[in-house]
Design a protein with these regions (language model features):
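Bacterial N-terminal signal peptides
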Residues: 2-12
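Charged catalytic cores and adjacent phosphate/nucleic-acid-binding surfaces used
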Residues: 15-49, 68, 131-138, 173-354
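A metal-dependent hydrolase metal-coordination microenvironment
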Residues: 26-160, 166, 175, 188, ...
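Conserved catalytic scaffold of divalent metal-dependent phosphoesterases
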Residues: 168-170
Length: 354
């Protein structure tokens, strides 16, 4: 009798008010936001962003509202849809009301149901040596639609744009710093560079952060459905902002407060790497001996850290949310092999500083 009553209750719950339709509640989707735990650092909020994506309004294959949904699902705080100015293969399917601002406007409307920071932007697209440049925080992307790419950049800069040099190793797998880039950097007209793009990283470009003063980024450059491209967490740029707002993000980018995150590899300047590692990893002395200490290391982030103790190539993996024990000799160097400061250079501190 009880079983029959329970079955009737479940059946009643699963049915719509009518008799001819049956709803299966186990099939009803309600995907939540997958938070990415990366702590704030002293004085700043840590925001997670993707500053290079595409939709159907250039050569992407999804509507801009899906880019907003994906970014929210994946725990991002910031999203820029940066359509190619010069390459719009689907243009014939749209009417004359569509321009270079349309994707941003649709994303902004879709974001009313979310709480992302939507950055207006566009991608100025040329072959090397010029390459591809994103203009971020633009007020009218149509002003970039001119024949001369240098004039396009000037028009964007006149709007207060931040210029990001995209995928310097694409399409020839060579990261070449051409004279045109050196001149633009010297004039303060290129501000950042993608250390990571899609599933690639560019080790040569790691050194450009210190050598040329560029700010590091890692972005998805997604064109298709993002779940079909990345087997794990999408690339993202960490932004250390004074406040969670569009103006806060803009101020942080122009100040250069960024780190790139590709897979579990962080890259950028030591002044932001050091405080982030300090907040992510908690070192607690478990045993204090004459010549060494045993530490309990707790990873309070969603980044997997690889720690090298001394020069013995003894690697300790600190997985997200886990605590590991490790013996460290007093005065020994501790190197974080997933924290990149340059090509072949990693963030390292002495045991006495732990």
């Amino acid at each position: 009798m009880i079983a029959a009553a329970l079955f009737a209750a479940v059946l009643s719950f699963a049915q719509s008010p009518g008799e001819d339709t049956f709803i299966h509640p186990e099939l009803v989707g309600n995907r939540g936001r997958g938070e990415v735990k990366i702590p704030d650092i002293e004085g700043y909020i840590t925001l997670k962003g993707d500053f290079h994506t595409h939709s159907v309004f250039s050569d992407g294959s999804v509507w801009p509202n899906m880019r907003v949904e994906e970014a929210w699902w994946h725990g991002l705080d910031i999203l820029a849809i940066t359509e190619h100015i010069e390459y719009r293969p689907k243009k014939k399917y749209f009417n004359d009301s569509v321009d270079h601002n349309t994707a941003y406007e649709i994303a902004l409307e879709a974001n009313k149901k979310k709480d992302l920071i939507i950055v207006p932007g566009a991608e100025v697209t040329r072959k090397k040596p010029f390459g591809h440049m994103n203009a971020l925080f633009v007020t009218d992307a149509n002003a970039a639609d001119v024949k001369d790419p240098m004039q396009a950049i000037e028009n964007m800069l006149a709007q207060g744009a931040y210029i990001l040099w995209n995928h310097p190793g694409w399409p020839d797998d060579l990261c070449t710093m051409y004279d045109i880039h050196k001149d633009l950097i010297k004039q303060g007209k290129i501000h950042g560079v993608e250390i990571g793009n899609d599933v690639e990283s560019y080790p040569v470009a790691y050194d450009w952060i210190t050598e040329y003063g560029l700010h590091p980024f890692a972005n998805s450059d997604i064109h298709g459905y993002i779940e079909a491209v990345f087997a794990s967490r999408r690339p993202m740029t960490l932004v250390f902002a004074k406040e969670r707002s569009l103006e806060g993000v803009k101020e942080a980018l122009f100040a250069g407060r960024t780190l790139s995150l590709t897979a579990d590899n962080l890259a950028g300047r030591v002044e932001y790497m050091a405080p982030l590692v300090k907040e992510c990893l908690k070192f607690e002395v478990y045993k204090d001996k004459d010549t060494y200490c045993v530490y309990k290391i707790t990873n309070d982030s969603d980044i997997r850290f690889v720690i090298e103790v001394g020069d013995t190539m003894h690697l300790v993996e600190a997985e997200p949310g886990q605590t590991v024990k490790v013996e460290i000799a007093k005065g020994q160097q501790v190197t974080f092999r997933n924290c990149i400061l340059g090509k072949g250079k990693y963030y390292s501190i002495n045991q006495s500083e732990l």
